[in-house]
C-alpha cells in the first residue's frame, strides 16, 4: 500500500480552501446575464466554450492532492444541485464558496466547528421554508418561457421553444434534445405513441416516395413471443381479410416462413399487413406491450394468461385511426382504448415513478407515461459550428430541467433576489449558544453571495446594489441585463423555487462538512526524481577534459 500524507487542523483547512476557491472562481465567472465564457481544452479536437457551471466544474482537477480534495467537494455541490433540479449549479458553487470562506474564518478565530454547522443547518431550514412560501405557481406559457430564457443564459429563442414544446405535449410529455442539422432551433412533435422499432421487411412499404408503411384504420395483433410458423397466424389473417381492414402485428419477432407469407400476402393485396418487433426488452417489453394494448383497446396474446395465437379472434385485436412505420420508428395515432383504462394505467405508472429509486427506471417510466398521456416533442438545436452546437445543447438541457422544476414547485424572483428576501426568516432566529448564532450570521452573509456575484460579473458595485435591494420589498430587485431596478417577476426574471432551494441545501450540506474537517489523508507525493536510463558508455567523449 502506498504511503499516505496526513495534514491536520489549520494547515489541512488552508489547503482545502485553496482548492475550493480555484474551482469556485472558475465557475462563478459564468453567473448571471453578463457572465463570461470559460474555454475548456480537450485532449483532441477543438476546445469547448461554455457558460454552463457544471461543465466547467467537471473539467477541473488540481495537481496538489489536498487542494484537489477541496475542489472535488465543491464539484460535488454542483453535481448534487444538478441531480436534484437539473440547474442552479453555479449558484450552489457560489453559496458553498461563501459558506466555506466565512466558516473557516470563524473556526480560525476559535469557534466550535460543530456548533457553527448546527447554526448553519438551523438557518438553512428556515430559509428553505421561507422560499417555499415565496414561490408562486408557474402555470402559463409566458412564465415557462421566461424561466427557460433565464436558465439558458438569457437566450429568448430557447425559452420560447421549450414553452411551445410543453404547450404541445403537456407538462407530463417527454421532451428530448438532439443536435440539429440547420442553423436555427427546430421543434417537431410526435402525436400518438411512438416506439423505436421499424418495419421488419421493406416489402411492407406502401408509400415509396417517403419510404414508409402507412395503415389506415388498422387492427393491431399484439403477441409476446416469436412467430415463425404461419399456421398459428392463419385464423387471425383469415378473419382480418374478411373484415377488409389492414393489420399491424407487434411481436417479439416475426421470422422465416411467417414473415415470407405476410410479405407475399401484402404484395398480392390479399391482406394489407405490416409487422414490427415489440419495443423494449424482458419485463419492460411486456409492460410496453400492455401499454399498447390499453391504448388501442386490444389484448396481449400471451401464454401466461392462457391465450394462444391459434385461438385469437378479432375481439382480441386493438384498433387505431392510423399507424405509420418507417425503418426506425412506429407511430400509433389515435388508439381506440377506453379513456378510463388509459387514465388508470397512467396513475399506476405514476405510482411506480414515485416508488422507484433508480434514475434509469424513472426515466423509462416517464417515457412510457408520456407516450400514454401526451406525446413526444423533439427540440433540434441549430448552430453554425460544432463547438457552438455542444455549448447550446448543454444550455437547452439546463433550461428544460429548470422549466420542469418550475412547473413542479413554482417560481421565485430571480437574480439572487429570492435568497435575499428569504433572509427575513432568520431575522430573530437564535441558536442554543453564541457559536450557533455565529453560524446563523455566517449564512446570512453567504446568502447574499449570488446577487453580489451577478452584479460583479455585470461590472457593477455589489455592496451598493445589495443595499438597495434590501431596502426594497417583495419582488423588487436588480436586472443585471439592463442595469435597472424593478419588479423581477414583471421583468420576466424568474428562478424555479426548486433550483434555488436545492442549490442552498447542497451548498450548506457540503459547506458544513468542510468546516468540520479536522484531518485530511492523501497519497504522499513521490519525492524521488525518476531514475535516468542507463546511458550505455557514452563512447567517443574522450578529449573533453579541457571543458571544465
Swiss-Prot record:
InterPro entries: Chaperonin_Cpn60_CS (IPR018370), Cpn60/GroEL (IPR001844), Cpn60/GroEL/TCP-1 (IPR002423), GroEL-like_apical_dom_sf (IPR027409), GROEL-like_equatorial_sf (IPR027413), TCP-1-like_intermed_sf (IPR027410). It catalyses: ATP + H2O + a folded polypeptide = ADP + phosphate + an unfolded polypeptide. Its EC number is 5.6.1.7. The keyword Isomerase applies. ATP binds at residues 30-33, 51, 87-91, 415, 479-481, 495. GO terms for cellular component: cytoplasm. PANTHER family: 60 KDA HEAT SHOCK PROTEIN, MITOCHONDRIAL. NCBIfam families: GroEL, PRK00013.1, PRK12849.1, PRK12850.1, PRK12851.1. Together with its co-chaperonin GroES, plays an essential role in assisting protein folding. The GroEL-GroES system forms a nano-cage that allows encapsulation of the non-native substrate proteins and provides a physical environment optimized to promote and accelerate protein folding. Forms a cylinder of 14 subunits composed of two heptameric rings stacked back-to-back. Interacts with the co-chaperonin GroES. This is Chaperonin GroEL. It comes from Ectopseudomonas mendocina (strain ymp) (Pseudomonas mendocina). The gene is groEL.
Amino acid at each position: 500500500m502506498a504511503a499516505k500524507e496526513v495534514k491536520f487542523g489549520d494547515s489541512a483547512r488552508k489547503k482545502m480552501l485553496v482548492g475550493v476557491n480555484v474551482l469556485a472562481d472558475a465557475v462563478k465567472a459564468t453567473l448571471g446575464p453578463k457572465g463570461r465564457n470559460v474555454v475548456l481544452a480537450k485532449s483532441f479536437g477543438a476546445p469547448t466554450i461554455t457558460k454552463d457551471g457544471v461543465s466547467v466544474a467537471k473539467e477541473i482537477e488540481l495537481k496538489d492532492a489536498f487542494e484537489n480534495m477541496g475542489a472535488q467537494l465543491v464539484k460535488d455541490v454542483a453535481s448534487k444541485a444538478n441531480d436534484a433540479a437539473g440547474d442552479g449549479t453555479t449558484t450552489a458553487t457560489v453559496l458553498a464558496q461563501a459558506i466555506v470562506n466565512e466558516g473557516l474564518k470563524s473556526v480560525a478565530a476559535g469557534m466550535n466547528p460543530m456548533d457553527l454547522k448546527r447554526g448553519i443547518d438551523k438557518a438553512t431550514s428556515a430559509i428553505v421554508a421561507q422560499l417555499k412560501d415565496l414561490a408562486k405557481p408557474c402555470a402559463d406559457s409566458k412564465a415557462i418561457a421566461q424561466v427557460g430564457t433565464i436558465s439558458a443564459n438569457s437566450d429568448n429563442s430557447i425559452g420560447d421553444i421549450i414553452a411551445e414544446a410543453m404547450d404541445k405535449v403537456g407538462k407530463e410529455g417527454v421532451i428530448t434534445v438532439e443536435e440539429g442539422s440547420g442553423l436555427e432551433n427546430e421543434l417537431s412533435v410526435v402525436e400518438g405513441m411512438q416506439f423505436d422499432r421499424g418495419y421488419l421487411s421493406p416489402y411492407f412499404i406502401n408509400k415509396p416516395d417517403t419510404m414508409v408503411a402507412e395503415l389506415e384504420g388498422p387492427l393491431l395483433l399484439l403477441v409476446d413471443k416469436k412467430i415463425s410458423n404461419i399456421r398459428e397466424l392463419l385464423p387471425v389473417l383469415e378473419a382480418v381479410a374478411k373484415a377488409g381492414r389492414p393489420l399491424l402485428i407487434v411481436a417479439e419477432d416475426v421470422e422465416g416462413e411467417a414473415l415470407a407469407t405476410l410479405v407475399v400476402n401484402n404484395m398480392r393485396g390479399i391482406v394489407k399487413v405490416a409487422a414490427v418487433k415489440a419495443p423494449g426488452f424482458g419485463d419492460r417489453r411486456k409492460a410496453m406491450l400492455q401499454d399498447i394494448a390499453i391504448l388501442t383497446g386490444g389484448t396481449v396474446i400471451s401464454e401466461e394468461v392462457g391465450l394462444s395465437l391459434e385461438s385469437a379472434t378479432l375481439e382480441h385485436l386493438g384498433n387505431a385511426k392510423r399507424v405509420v412505420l418507417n425503418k426506425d420508428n412506429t407511430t400509433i395515432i389515435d388508439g381506440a382504448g377506453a379513456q378510463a383504462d388509459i387514465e388508470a394505467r397512467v396513475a399506476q405508472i405514476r405510482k411506480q415513478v414515485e416508488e422507484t429509486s433508480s434514475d434509469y427506471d424513472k426515466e423509462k417510466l416517464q417515457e412510457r407515461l408520456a407516450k400514454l398521456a401526451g406525446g413526444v416533442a423533439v427540440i433540434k438545436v441549430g448552430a453554425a459550428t460544432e463547438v457552438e452546437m455542444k455549448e447550446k445543447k448543454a444550455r437547452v438541457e439546463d433550461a428544460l430541467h429548470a422549466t420542469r422544476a418550475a412547473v413542479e414547485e413554482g417560481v421565485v424572483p430571480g437574480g439572487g433576489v429570492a435568497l435575499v428576501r428569504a433572509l427575513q426568516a432568520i431575522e430573530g432566529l437564535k441558536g442554543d449558544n453564541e457559536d450557533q448564532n455565529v453560524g446563523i450570521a455566517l449564512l446570512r452573509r453567504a446568502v447574499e453571495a449570488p446577487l453580489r456575484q451577478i452584479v460583479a460579473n455585470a461590472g457593477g458595485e455589489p455592496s451598493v446594489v445589495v443595499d438597495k435591494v434590501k431596502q426594497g420589498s417583495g419582488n423588487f430587485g436588480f436586472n443585471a441585463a439592463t442595469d435597472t431596478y424593478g419588479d423581477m417577476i414583471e421583468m420576466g426574471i424568474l428562478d424555479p423555487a426548486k433550483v434555488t432551494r436545492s442549490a442552498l441545501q447542497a451548498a450548506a450540506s457540503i459547506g458544513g462538512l468542510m468546516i468540520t474537517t479536522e484531518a485530511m489523508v492523501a497519497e504522499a507525493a513521490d519525492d524521488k526524481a525518476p531514475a535516468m536510463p542507463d546511458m550505455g558508455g557514452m563512447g567517443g567523449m574522450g578529449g573533453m577534459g579541457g571543458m571544465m
